[in-house]
UniProtKB/Swiss-Prot annotation:
Domain of life assignment: Eukaryota
One Pfam family this sequence matches: Ribosomal_S7
Keyword Ribosomal protein: yes
Listed InterPro entries: Ribosomal_uS7, Ribosomal_uS7_bac/org-type, Ribosomal_uS7_dom, Ribosomal_uS7_dom_sf
Function: One of the primary rRNA binding proteins, it binds directly to 16S rRNA where it nucleates assembly of the head domain of the 30S subunit.
Alphabetically ordered keywords of this record: Chloroplast, Plastid, Ribonucleoprotein, Ribosomal protein, RNA-binding, rRNA-binding
Disulfide topology: none
Subunit structure: Part of the 30S ribosomal subunit.
Gene Ontology process terms (BP): translation
Compartment(s) of residence: Plastid, Chloroplast
Protein name in the entry: Small ribosomal subunit protein uS7c
Length: 167
């Protein structure tokens, strides 16, 4: 039994304009050095531009893009018999998958060579919405690794089913 008291799960409040938790998570990920107002400007300008280009609700486009990038499995390195094996497991928590998807989207934004973060984030979200781009490639790579290493899992068939449904 742990001596430390169990930490309560921190509740994330939705953002003030779009009233969406995933948008607020994006703002917190974009924020650097505590400059939250700048992060809000970047994200809101990005969503405004997405709404103008697609003629759809920008939050729905963003959440669909997030759903497209979100992985269904994860791989964890385990040491067995002197060698390190990547053992896949299914992601049951959507928050963990969302955090991974946001991280991948922002990493691929930083690799792009555009002038502003707004334009980079907009192109990456639209690419993820159309199921192309670097973040989607990263998800497919992870699912390929999980399918190849499914034999190391306790239930390999469940891993293969989760990966094949997505692909």
């Amino acid at each position: 039994m742990p001596r430390r008291p169990i930490q309560k799960k921190r509740s994330v409040l939705p953002d003030p304009i779009y009233n969406s938790i995933s948008v607020h998570m994006l703002v917190n990920r974009v924020m650097k050095n505590g400059k939250k107002s700048l992060a809000y400007k970047i994200v809101y300008n990005t969503l405004k531009n997405i709404g103008e280009t697609t003629q759809q609700n920008p939050v729905e486009v963003f959440e669909a893009a997030l759903e497209n990038v979100m992985p269904k499995v994860e791989v964890q390195p385990r040491r067995r018999a002197g060698s390190v094996q990547m053992v896949p497991s299914i992601l049951r928590s959507t928050e963990r998958g969302q955090a991974t998807a946001l991280r991948w989207i922002l990493e691929s934004c930083e690799k792009k060579s555009a002038k502003s973060m707004v334009s980079k984030l907009q192109t990456e979200i639209l690419d993820a919405y159309e199921k192309k781009g670097n973040a989607i490639k990263k998800k497919e790579e992870l699912h390929k690794i999980a399918a190849n290493n499914a034999m190391y899992s306790n239930r390999p068939q469940i891993i293969l089913n989760a990966v094949s449904i997505v692909s």
